Protein backbone atom coordinates (compact mmCIF):
# COMPACT_ATOMS: atom_id res chain seq x y z
CA UNK A 1 0.00 0.00 0.00
CA UNK A 2 1.58 3.25 -1.19
CA UNK A 3 1.51 6.69 0.33
CA UNK A 4 -0.82 9.39 -0.88
CA UNK A 5 0.02 13.08 -1.37
CA UNK A 6 -1.09 16.46 -0.06
CA UNK A 7 -2.20 18.89 -2.75
CA UNK A 8 -3.91 22.25 -3.04
CA UNK A 9 -6.98 22.80 -5.20
CA UNK A 10 -6.30 25.35 -7.93
CA UNK A 11 -9.62 25.23 -9.77
CA UNK A 12 -11.42 23.57 -12.68
CA UNK A 13 -10.83 23.64 -16.42
CA UNK A 14 -11.26 21.28 -19.34
CA UNK A 15 -8.91 19.38 -21.60
CA UNK A 16 -9.57 18.05 -25.08
CA UNK A 17 -8.80 14.57 -26.35
CA UNK A 18 -7.47 13.81 -29.81
CA UNK A 19 -11.02 12.87 -30.80
CA UNK A 20 -12.24 16.36 -29.87
CA UNK A 21 -14.05 15.34 -26.71
CA UNK A 22 -13.69 17.67 -23.75
CA UNK A 23 -13.09 16.36 -20.23
CA UNK A 24 -13.82 18.54 -17.17
CA UNK A 25 -10.86 18.31 -14.79
CA UNK A 26 -9.80 19.70 -11.43
CA UNK A 27 -6.24 21.02 -11.19
CA UNK A 28 -4.37 20.04 -8.02
CA UNK A 29 -0.96 21.46 -7.15
CA UNK A 30 1.66 19.60 -5.13
CA UNK A 31 3.41 22.38 -3.21
CA UNK A 32 6.72 20.90 -2.06
CA UNK A 33 5.09 17.79 -0.58
CA UNK A 34 7.79 16.22 1.59
CA UNK A 35 8.07 13.33 4.03
CA UNK A 36 8.52 14.85 7.50
CA UNK A 37 8.30 11.75 9.68
CA UNK A 38 7.78 8.00 10.00
CA UNK A 39 5.40 5.98 12.15
CA UNK A 40 6.73 2.49 12.84
CA UNK A 41 5.01 -0.60 14.15
CA UNK A 42 7.55 -1.06 16.95
CA UNK A 43 7.22 2.47 18.29
CA UNK A 44 3.70 3.54 17.30
CA UNK A 45 1.86 0.30 16.66
CA UNK A 46 1.30 1.00 12.96
CA UNK A 47 3.25 1.93 9.83
CA UNK A 48 2.64 5.31 8.22
CA UNK A 49 4.30 8.29 6.58
CA UNK A 50 3.80 11.83 7.82
CA UNK A 51 3.79 14.30 4.92
CA UNK A 52 3.88 18.07 4.92
CA UNK A 53 3.10 20.62 2.21
CA UNK A 54 3.07 24.38 1.79
CA UNK A 55 5.33 26.97 3.39
CA UNK A 56 4.81 28.37 6.87
CA UNK A 57 6.82 30.85 8.93
CA UNK A 58 8.33 29.20 11.96
CA UNK A 59 7.63 32.27 14.12
CA UNK A 60 3.92 31.39 14.02
CA UNK A 61 4.45 27.77 15.06
CA UNK A 62 4.57 26.22 18.54
CA UNK A 63 8.04 25.25 19.70
CA UNK A 64 7.10 21.57 19.74
CA UNK A 65 6.22 21.63 16.03
CA UNK A 66 9.33 23.62 15.21
CA UNK A 67 11.38 20.97 16.96
CA UNK A 68 9.81 18.19 14.92
CA UNK A 69 10.67 19.89 11.64
CA UNK A 70 14.17 20.68 12.90
CA UNK A 71 14.81 17.02 13.71
CA UNK A 72 13.57 16.01 10.26
CA UNK A 73 15.71 18.79 8.67
CA UNK A 74 12.68 19.96 6.70
CA UNK A 75 11.30 23.47 6.28
CA UNK A 76 8.13 24.14 8.36
CA UNK A 77 4.95 23.06 6.59
CA UNK A 78 1.49 24.59 6.60
CA UNK A 79 -0.39 21.31 6.16
CA UNK A 80 0.58 17.96 7.70
CA UNK A 81 -1.17 14.62 7.17
CA UNK A 82 -0.49 10.94 7.78
CA UNK A 83 -0.87 8.12 5.28
CA UNK A 84 -0.95 4.46 6.28
CA UNK A 85 1.50 2.45 4.18
CA UNK A 86 2.90 -1.05 4.05
CA UNK A 87 6.40 -1.68 5.39
CA UNK A 88 7.83 -1.97 1.87
CA UNK A 89 6.46 1.48 0.89
CA UNK A 90 8.53 3.61 3.28
CA UNK A 91 9.98 6.77 1.70
CA UNK A 92 13.00 8.50 3.30
CA UNK A 93 12.44 11.58 5.46
CA UNK A 94 13.02 14.76 3.47
CA UNK A 95 12.11 13.21 0.11
CA UNK A 96 9.78 15.29 -2.06
CA UNK A 97 6.97 13.35 -3.74
CA UNK A 98 6.45 14.29 -7.38
CA UNK A 99 3.28 14.64 -9.47
CA UNK A 100 4.14 11.51 -11.48
CA UNK A 101 3.68 9.49 -8.29
CA UNK A 102 0.34 8.82 -10.01
CA UNK A 103 0.17 7.63 -13.62
CA UNK A 104 -2.24 8.79 -16.30
CA UNK A 105 -5.33 6.62 -16.40
CA UNK A 106 -5.20 5.36 -12.83
CA UNK A 107 -8.01 6.02 -10.36
CA UNK A 108 -7.58 7.95 -7.12
CA UNK A 109 -9.65 8.74 -4.03
CA UNK A 110 -9.71 12.45 -3.18
CA UNK A 111 -10.57 13.85 0.26
CA UNK A 112 -11.29 17.49 1.09
CA UNK A 113 -13.44 19.81 3.19
CA UNK A 114 -16.65 20.83 1.44
CA UNK A 115 -17.60 24.48 0.96
CA UNK A 116 -19.60 25.94 3.85
CA UNK A 117 -23.19 26.97 3.06
CA UNK A 118 -24.20 28.29 6.46
CA UNK A 119 -27.64 27.58 7.96
CA UNK A 120 -29.76 25.85 5.33
CA UNK A 121 -33.35 24.64 5.21
CA UNK A 122 -34.54 21.12 4.56
CA UNK A 123 -35.09 21.66 0.83
CA UNK A 124 -31.54 22.85 0.21
CA UNK A 125 -29.79 20.66 2.75
CA UNK A 126 -31.62 17.35 2.19
CA UNK A 127 -33.46 17.89 -1.10
CA UNK A 128 -36.90 17.77 0.54
CA UNK A 129 -39.87 18.49 -1.72
CA UNK A 130 -41.47 21.12 0.50
CA UNK A 131 -45.22 21.66 0.88
CA UNK A 132 -47.76 22.53 -1.82
CA UNK A 133 -47.74 25.90 -3.55
CA UNK A 134 -51.47 26.45 -2.93
CA UNK A 135 -54.58 24.63 -1.64
CA UNK A 136 -54.43 25.89 1.90
CA UNK A 137 -50.66 26.21 2.38
CA UNK A 138 -49.58 29.67 3.41
CA UNK A 139 -46.15 30.97 4.47
CA UNK A 140 -44.76 27.47 5.09
CA UNK A 141 -44.17 26.36 1.47
CA UNK A 142 -40.52 25.46 2.14
CA UNK A 143 -40.97 23.94 5.59
CA UNK A 144 -40.09 20.28 6.22
CA UNK A 145 -43.52 19.27 7.54
CA UNK A 146 -43.99 16.73 10.31
CA UNK A 147 -40.89 15.51 12.16
CA UNK A 148 -42.38 12.48 13.92
CA UNK A 149 -45.42 10.50 15.00
CA UNK A 150 -48.20 11.15 17.51
CA UNK A 151 -48.40 9.85 21.06
CA UNK A 152 -46.44 6.83 19.83
CA UNK A 153 -43.44 7.26 19.66
CA UNK A 154 -44.10 10.68 21.16
CA UNK A 155 -40.72 12.09 20.18
CA UNK A 156 -38.50 13.04 17.25
CA UNK A 157 -35.78 10.47 16.72
CA UNK A 158 -32.13 11.40 16.72
CA UNK A 159 -30.44 12.02 13.35
CA UNK A 160 -33.72 13.18 11.81
CA UNK A 161 -33.00 15.21 8.68
CA UNK A 162 -33.79 18.79 9.63
CA UNK A 163 -32.61 22.34 8.84
CA UNK A 164 -29.17 23.18 10.17
CA UNK A 165 -25.57 23.93 9.32
CA UNK A 166 -24.60 22.76 5.84
CA UNK A 167 -21.10 22.19 4.47
CA UNK A 168 -17.62 22.19 6.05
CA UNK A 169 -17.75 18.39 6.11
CA UNK A 170 -14.93 15.98 5.35
CA UNK A 171 -15.87 14.50 1.98
CA UNK A 172 -14.16 11.71 0.04
CA UNK A 173 -14.84 11.31 -3.68
CA UNK A 174 -13.96 7.85 -4.98
CA UNK A 175 -12.52 6.68 -8.28
CA UNK A 176 -11.52 9.91 -10.03
CA UNK A 177 -9.38 9.25 -13.09
CA UNK A 178 -5.99 10.92 -13.51
CA UNK A 179 -6.03 12.73 -16.87
CA UNK A 180 -2.63 14.48 -16.91
CA UNK A 181 0.44 15.09 -14.76
CA UNK A 182 2.94 17.94 -14.98
CA UNK A 183 6.10 17.17 -13.02
CA UNK A 184 7.85 20.50 -13.67
CA UNK A 185 4.96 22.58 -12.32
CA UNK A 186 3.80 19.95 -9.83
CA UNK A 187 0.28 19.70 -11.25
CA UNK A 188 -2.13 16.79 -11.14
CA UNK A 189 -5.29 16.88 -13.29
CA UNK A 190 -8.12 14.57 -12.23
CA UNK A 191 -11.41 14.08 -14.03
CA UNK A 192 -14.49 15.58 -12.40
CA UNK A 193 -15.11 17.73 -9.35
CA UNK A 194 -13.17 17.67 -6.09
CA UNK A 195 -14.69 18.72 -2.74
CA UNK A 196 -13.57 22.04 -1.30
CA UNK A 197 -12.95 25.61 -2.36
CA UNK A 198 -10.07 27.02 -4.39
CA UNK A 199 -6.92 26.99 -2.31
CA UNK A 200 -8.24 24.24 -0.04
CA UNK A 201 -6.02 21.37 1.05
CA UNK A 202 -6.72 18.01 -0.56
CA UNK A 203 -5.36 14.52 0.09
CA UNK A 204 -5.02 12.15 -2.86
CA UNK A 205 -4.60 8.38 -2.48
CA UNK A 206 -4.61 5.34 -4.74
CA UNK A 207 -8.20 4.19 -5.24
CA UNK A 208 -9.23 1.52 -2.74
CA UNK A 209 -11.80 -0.08 -5.04
CA UNK A 210 -9.69 -0.10 -8.21
CA UNK A 211 -6.50 -2.07 -8.98
CA UNK A 212 -3.19 -0.22 -8.96
CA UNK A 213 -1.70 0.02 -12.47
CA UNK A 214 1.50 -1.92 -13.11
CA UNK A 215 3.16 1.30 -14.27
CA UNK A 216 2.71 2.97 -10.87
CA UNK A 217 5.98 3.52 -9.03
CA UNK A 218 6.63 1.53 -5.87
CA UNK A 219 7.14 2.80 -3.23
CA UNK A 220 6.58 6.03 -5.20
CA UNK A 221 8.06 8.74 -7.41
CA UNK A 222 10.09 11.14 -5.29
CA UNK A 223 13.16 13.35 -5.24
CA UNK A 224 15.64 12.85 -2.44
CA UNK A 225 16.53 15.70 -0.10
CA UNK A 226 20.15 15.76 -1.33
CA UNK A 227 18.99 16.33 -4.91
CA UNK A 228 19.37 12.72 -5.97
CA UNK A 229 17.43 11.04 -8.73
CA UNK A 230 13.80 10.16 -8.34
CA UNK A 231 12.77 6.59 -7.53
CA UNK A 232 12.34 4.50 -10.64
CA UNK A 233 8.92 3.60 -11.96
CA UNK A 234 8.04 0.01 -11.13
CA UNK A 235 9.82 -2.77 -9.21
CA UNK A 236 10.44 -4.89 -12.30
CA UNK A 237 11.88 -1.87 -14.11
CA UNK A 238 14.16 -0.82 -11.27
CA UNK A 239 16.16 -3.98 -10.69
CA UNK A 240 19.72 -3.05 -9.83
CA UNK A 241 18.97 0.66 -9.41
CA UNK A 242 19.17 2.64 -6.19
CA UNK A 243 16.73 5.33 -5.16
Swiss-Prot record:
Modified residues (N5-methylglutamine): 151
Keyword Ribonucleoprotein set for record: yes
Cysteine disulfide partners in this protein: none
SUPFAM superfamilies: Translation proteins (SSF50447)
Region annotation Disordered: where it falls in the sequence: 139-164, 218-243
Domain of life: Bacteria
GO BP annotations, alphabetical order: translation
Gene3D superfamilies assigned: 3.30.160.810, Translation factors
Post-translational modification: Methylated by PrmB.
Pfam families with a match to the protein in the record: Ribosomal_L3
InterPro entries attached to this UniProt entry: Ribosomal_uL3 (IPR000597), Ribosomal_uL3_bac/org-type (IPR019927), Ribosomal_uL3_CS (IPR019926), Transl_B-barrel_sf (IPR009000)
Compositionally biased tracts (Basic and acidic residues): 218-229
GO cellular component: cytosolic large ribosomal subunit
Function recorded in the entry: One of the primary rRNA binding proteins, it binds directly near the 3'-end of the 23S rRNA, where it nucleates assembly of the 50S subunit.
Xref: PANTHER family: 50S RIBOSOMAL PROTEIN L3, LARGE RIBOSOMAL SUBUNIT PROTEIN UL3C
Family that this chain belongs to: Belongs to the universal ribosomal protein uL3 family.
HAMAP family in alphabetical order: Ribosomal_uL3_B
Protein name from the UniProt record: Large ribosomal subunit protein uL3
Source organism of the structure: Afipia carboxidovorans (strain ATCC 49405 / DSM 1227 / KCTC 32145 / OM5)
Gene (UniProt): rplC
